[in-house]
Amino acid sequence: MADTAKPKGGSAKASGSRRRNSRKDTSGIANENPDALLDLYRRMLFIRRFEERTSQAYTQARIGGYCHLNLGEEATVVGLMSALRETDYLYTNYRDHGYAIEKGMDPKRVMAELYGRKDGVAKGWGGSMHMYDTETRMLGGYGIVGGQLPLAAGAALAVSYRETDDVVMCQMGDGTTNIGAWHETLNIAKLWNLPIVFVVVNNFTGMGTTVDMSSAEPDLYKRGSAFRIEGERVDGRDVLAVRDAATRLVERAREEQTPFLLEAWSYRMKGHSVVDPAKYRTQEQKDEARAKENDPVAIFGDQLTKADVLSEEGREEIAASVKERVAEAADFAENSPHPDVSTLFDYTYATPVPNESRRMPADPVFAD
């Protein structure tokens, strides 16, 4: 088990003494490929800026519906995705933008989906919570808490039947561990020895309820033990630690054909969604979460600078490149057409039926 210190702002009962005071430890960087390290940093920064632009567009009413951001969870997202092959499958909850990009989706099409435009990854019908792409094997994006778990187990069962060495990763938030589908899915996954890694991104608050107040066992990685599923915990702010832990469990699932559980301590910088003011957190907790010492992007950048991998000039170059790519994604979304109303009911049914949208609004059935 890779146990770590909990961020102070994460829980009403969290103690500052459990936190690691310094986040600039470079002990694990010396043996890493410098180009690979810079790539991790670049990907983390891109998610940060992409989500910031998403938040801005939402407040400008360019994006509608629900919207949940990965701000503060960039190291977790990038670390997890670094453990997967292109042929591995991914299921996530509604906080899925960063995962979609990391799994290989074009950021332009992800942004277009957020805008509800025709060129989006789900043709503008899914929006923020429902990123989906069979080519990259990112199969959602699910708006129902815990809804992705049984489906992920089904994909793992299909993998077993096909006798490939692919693995399914199923990401969720801490609140999902109290949903019935959690217990049912972990039970069947172990009974049938499915090649799946369950990942709980523990940001300590399920909407407005802390883990300490909702879970009798707040050490969530231990909750797999009821089903004899081995679990680990990792500091979700440490991209290398997340990558290593995820890689270890993914490869074990691949080789041993059995499920594993990974809990990643993380912290979202915003409320549950863009419109959530997070009044259930004290100002001290908010300030602590946003402090540089707990910011995963700043932490990793400082580590690379201290290790002479990333210069200040290099930081500026990466920042400029990322800014340009995010702007391109936003421009693409702005200029993408809206879906035609005639396609409203396309793909609603498994078997072809007349497109009912063509009856609107002139059809007498809609008349007063």
Roles of regions detected by a PLM:
Residues 1-76, 270, 278-368:
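Conserved acidic/glycine
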Residues 25-26, 31, 38-39, 43, ...:
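Mixed-charge, polar/low-complexity N-terminal
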Residues 52-56, 60-192, 210-216, 221, ...:
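Cofactor-binding active-site loop characterized by glycine-rich and histidine/acidic residues
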Residues 85, 106, 116, 219, ...:
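Alpha-helix initiation/capping motif
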Residues 94, 264-266, 348:
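A general secondary-structure junction signal
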Residues 100-102, 208, 272, 343:
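Short acidic, gly/pro-rich beta-turn/loop elements at beta-sheet edges
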Residues 138-335:
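Glycine-rich ThDP/TPP pyrophosphate-binding loop and its adjacent helix/strand module
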